[in-house]
Amino acid sequence: MFRRRDTETAGGGAANPGPVALPAPRQPLLPTYPPRGYLGQLDPAFQSALSKRREGANLEDFVWYHATELPDGTVLPGVWDLRGHESTYLGGVDFAGKRVLELGPATGYLTFHMERMGAEVVSFEAGFDVSIDTLPVKGEDQPWERLRVMQETIDRNHDAWWYLHRTFGSSAKFVQGNIYDMPGDLGIFDITVVGAILLHLREPWGALSQAAQRTTETMVVTEPLQDDLDPPETNIMRFSPSAEHHLTNWWSIYPGAVDSMLGRCGFGKTETTMHSQRHHLAHDIGSDAIDQRMYTVVGHPVF
C-alpha cells in the first residue's frame, strides 16, 4: 500500500522522521543462492589488496559525490550534501546490528554513516562491464571516449571511497560485479539500501529483484522526483534521458512504481517519505546548489 509522509526541505532543518517499526525477520526468497562470477571478494586478503591498490591516489584527483566532513573538521565539497539529513534520506531505518547491502555507494558517505549507526556494510559497485548501462547515442556505435571518461570518474569515486575507509578506520567491504547477476557468495542481508541509482539502470526491476532475493527485513529505495506531471503514487516509469549525449540517465521513476516493484519482490508493506536534499546540477560543484525533490520508499515483507 502506498502511504506518503512529507518532511520539510533539507535546507529548512526539519527533524528527521523516527525509526520505521520492523516486522519479525523472514526467510529469504531463495535460502540457497548459487554462486556466480566475481567470487571471493569478501575474503580479507582480497579487501586488503584493494585497499593497498588505492593507497597511492592523490586527494586532489578524487571526485567527491557526497560532501564529507573529515575527523579534523575539513569539509570536502560534493555534488550532494546530505549532512544532517541522512536519516531522512534513508527512511528513518534503524541500522544498529544489521548486515546491510548498499547498492551504488559512490564516494561512501552513506557507507560510513550507516557503519557509525552500528551496521555491517557491504558496498556493491558496477564491475568492469559498466558499459551495459550506458544509453546508446544516435550516430555512435561505440562511444569509447565518453565511456572511458565515465569509467575514469567511477574509478576516482572508488579512490575516494577507500580514502575515507582508511581515514575513518572502517570495516566496511567493497565489492564489484553485475548488478543484475550479483555474486552468489555475498550472503544474506537484513537491509538493502538503493540510493538514487535506479534512474541510471537499464533494468531497475532486475536490480531490485536481485537485491530482494538476498534481503530478509527491509528494502530502502531513494530516488529523485524528476517531474510532477502525475501524482507521486502513480505507477509510472518514464523513459526520460536528460540530454542527447548523456550516458547514464534512463528513467524518471515515480514512487508508486517503486512501491509496486517492491511489492512484486515480496516487500509489499511500504511507507513513502517525500523530502529534499541539496544538490549541484550537472555535477558542477561551482554552481549554486538547489533543493532537489526526493522520495524514499521503505519496504518490509508481507507474511
Where does each model-flagged region fall?
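Short amphipathic alpha-helix with an adjacent loop that forms part of the alpha/beta core around
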Residues: 91, 181-188
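The conserved SAM/SAH-binding core of class I Rossmann-like methyltransferase domains
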Residues: 101, 124-125, 222
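Conserved class I S-adenosyl-L-methionine
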Residues: 98-106
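S-adenosyl-L-methionine-dependent methyltransferase catalytic module, highlighting the catalytic core
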Residues: 154, 180-184, 193, 202-210, ...
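Class I SAM-dependent methyltransferase SAM/SAH-binding core
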Residues: 109-181
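Membrane-proximal basic amphipathic "stem/tether" segments
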Residues: 1-57
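Short SAM/SAH-binding signature in class I
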Residues: 188-196
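Conserved alpha-helix/loop element of class I SAM-dependent methyltransferases that forms part
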Residues: 74-98
